[in-house]
Amino acid sequence: MHGTRSVLIVDDEVEIRHALRLLFEIEGFTVVGEAADGDAAIDLASELEPSFIVLDYSMPQMNGAEAAQEIRKVLPASRIVAFSALLDTKPAWADAYLNKDRITELMPLLRTFIR
């Protein structure tokens, strides 16, 4: 597994992935990869073994819940943050949840897992 500050970003919107990458890099996290759908997320998570996975719920081909279930099989220790505009509460498949409208709260949330 990469360092405790390694992140895989999974979102079908390139603008969201770009904004998250910038935010993570400014905060000293290492973005080890980006994926636009659940299938790619599973492959990259298995290959890169990130500490954190920021995972959108609504994506083409495979949603975040389905992807998280597969990722958990190979990386049970990785922390998955559900990052979605569609969900109102933390889903069972995630370690934490954050609405996309509250992006500024993402870094404090991740830091709680590092401590």
Where do the model's predicted regions map?
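Two-component/phosphorelay signaling modules centered on CheY-like receiver
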Residues: 14-33
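Active-site beta3 strand of CheY-like receiver
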Residues: 48-54
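Active-site residues of response regulator receiver
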Residues: 11, 56
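Non-catalytic signal-transmission and effector/linker regions of two-component phosphorelay proteins
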Residues: 1-6, 104-115
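Acidic catalytic/metal-coordinating carboxylates
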Residues: 37-40, 63-67
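Receiver (REC) domain active-site loop signature in two-component systems and cognate sites
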Residues: 59
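Conserved phosphotransfer cores of two-component systems
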Residues: 46-48, 70-78
